[in-house]
From Swiss-Prot:
Protein name, per record: Adenosine 5'-phosphosulfate reductase
Species this protein is from: Bacillus cereus (strain ATCC 10987 / NRS 248)
Gene: cysH
Cysteine pairings via disulfide bonds: none
Family: Belongs to the PAPS reductase family. CysH subfamily.
One cellular component term from this protein's GO annotations in UniProt: cytoplasm
Sample GO molecular function, one term: adenylyl-sulfate reductase (thioredoxin) activity
InterPro entries with a match to the protein in the record: APS_reductase, PAPS/APS_Rdtase, PAPS_reduct_dom, Rossmann-like_a/b/a_fold
Function: Catalyzes the formation of sulfite from adenosine 5'-phosphosulfate (APS) using thioredoxin as an electron donor.
Catalysed reactions, as listed in the record: [thioredoxin]-disulfide + sulfite + AMP + 2 H(+) = adenosine 5'-phosphosulfate + [thioredoxin]-dithiol
Pathway: Sulfur metabolism; hydrogen sulfide biosynthesis; sulfite from sulfate
Record carries keyword Aminoacyl-tRNA synthetase: no
Length: 234
């Protein structure tokens, strides 16, 4: 088994010359390699809808973790329910932070997402994912190279130093248009916020719509020197 510790033995390669640009091959390998010791960390963005559909074809009872920060858009929570109805066999876990919002405010002050967004992300996303990955060998992410400068060198299989894990990214070669083409082709549910200028959807407090021609991550932590929550630093 390929693990964080045995990374030097990595000789896995995949062709992107197929209908899913390698995504199904990568997922098939991942579930064969890690069996029950792999989880998909899903934010329920539009890429997530594609991955859930593909994962359901490979492993209908796969584990899916949603990092419920308690400050997501209502539309996101409603979408999760639609996904549960569409893919009833998937094991969707809504992972809660250790601190409630009130407890966080008592310790660190109100609106931590404004005063210290890095700490807020650590408490409400990074630490919960660390807990979720504690007993896993690998995790799946919907990163695409096209999304931003910080993601353009992502590979199908990555040694993840942040979580000392293997990060599997099946959609790295997909374009924004290809993602949407797949969603429409398979009549997949998606977050209606995408239709009103939100290409990337995170917490309600830290996500704004993006103007025409903007980077897909421009609406995240707008006005701050921050483009990532910290889950995907290598």
């Amino acid at each position: 088994m390929l693990t964080y510790e045995t990374w030097e033995e990595n000789d896995v390669s995949f062709s992107e010359e197929d209908e899913t640009k390698g995504a199904l091959s990568v997922l098939s390998w991942a579930y064969k390699e890690y069996k029950s010791e792999i989880v998909y960390a899903c934010s329920f963005g539009v890429e997530g809808m594609v991955l859930l559909h593909l994962i359901n074809q490979v492993n209908p009872s796969a584990k899916v973790v949603f990092l419920d920060t308690n400050v997501h858009f209502q539309e996101t929570y409603e979408l999760i329910q639609k996904v549960r109805e569409r893919f009833p066999s998937l094991n969707i876990i809504e992972k809660q932070p250790e601190l409630t919002l009130d407890e966080q405010a008592n310790l660190h002050g109100d609106k931590l997402w404004e005063s210290n967004p890095n700490l807020c992300c650590k408490i409400r996303k990074i630490l919960p994912l660390e807990e979720s990955l504690a007993n896993e060998k690998a995790w799946i992410s919907g990163l695409r190279r096209e999304q931003s400068e910080t993601r353009k060198h992502t590979k199908f299989i990555n040694q993840d130093h942040r979580f000392r894990s293997i990060k599997v990214c099946p959609l790295i070669h997909w374009t924004w248009k290809e993602v949407w083409r797949y969603v429409y082709k398979h009549s997949l549910p998606y977050n209606p916020l995408h239709d009103i200028g939100y290409p990337s959807i995170g917490c309600e407090k830290c996500t704004l719509p993006v103007g025409e021609g903007g980077d897909s991550r421009d609406g995240r932590w707008a006005g701050k020197v921050k483009t990532e929550c910290g889950l995907h630093y290598q």
